[in-house]
């Protein structure tokens, strides 16, 4: 433990918290252009083809972002909105694409958790037709 004299000479340093989404530079979202859209495989016990995109943000940083939901319409040169949020089983993927904004369409046929996937509310008659199958 330091003496009072040592603390007078040099104050204690604050612990600086590291950002989990540094490319966003403290912004909630950033716009970017897809430079590559591809699939990749997750870490060990999981198995799948996860859809990801390499994106050049408006601040000139290049990041890898996950494309959530089933099916997407993204291709090279698509303009997308990127938010923070990692994918636990994809190393290096620390961002998510926001569905339903700019060039990223919402998920078709989505009835639950629609706001997370940019899907509009179905018309009253259509909700029953596209319901759960038993």
Swiss-Prot record:
InterPro entries: NA-bd_OB-fold (IPR012340), Ribosomal_uS12 (IPR006032), Ribosomal_uS12_bac (IPR005679)
Biased composition regions of type Low complexity, renumbered to the chain: 125-134
Molecular-function GO terms, alphabetical: rRNA binding; structural constituent of ribosome; tRNA binding
Gene3D superfamilies: Nucleic acid-binding proteins
Region feature (Disordered): 101-134
PROSITE patterns: RIBOSOMAL_S12
Protein family: Belongs to the universal ribosomal protein uS12 family.
Protein name: Small ribosomal subunit protein uS12
Organism: Gemmatimonas aurantiaca (strain DSM 14586 / JCM 11422 / NBRC 100505 / T-27)
């Amino acid at each position: 433990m330091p003496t009072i004299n040592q603390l007078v000479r040099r104050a204690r340093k604050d612990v600086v918290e590291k950002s989990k989404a540094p490319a966003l530079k403290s912004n909630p979202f950033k716009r970017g252009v897809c430079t590559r859209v591809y699939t990749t495989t997750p870490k060990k016990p999981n198995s799948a083809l996860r859809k990801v995109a390499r994106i050049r943000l408006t601040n000139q940083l290049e990041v890898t972002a996950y494309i959530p939901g089933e099916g997407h319409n993204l291709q090279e040169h698509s303009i997308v909105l990127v938010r923070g949020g990692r994918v636990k089983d994809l190393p290096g993927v620390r961002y998510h694409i926001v569905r339903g904004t700019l060039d990223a369409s919402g998920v078709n046929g989505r009835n639950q958790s629609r706001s997370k996937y940019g899907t509009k509310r179905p018309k009253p008659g259509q909700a029953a037709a596209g319901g759960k199958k038993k």
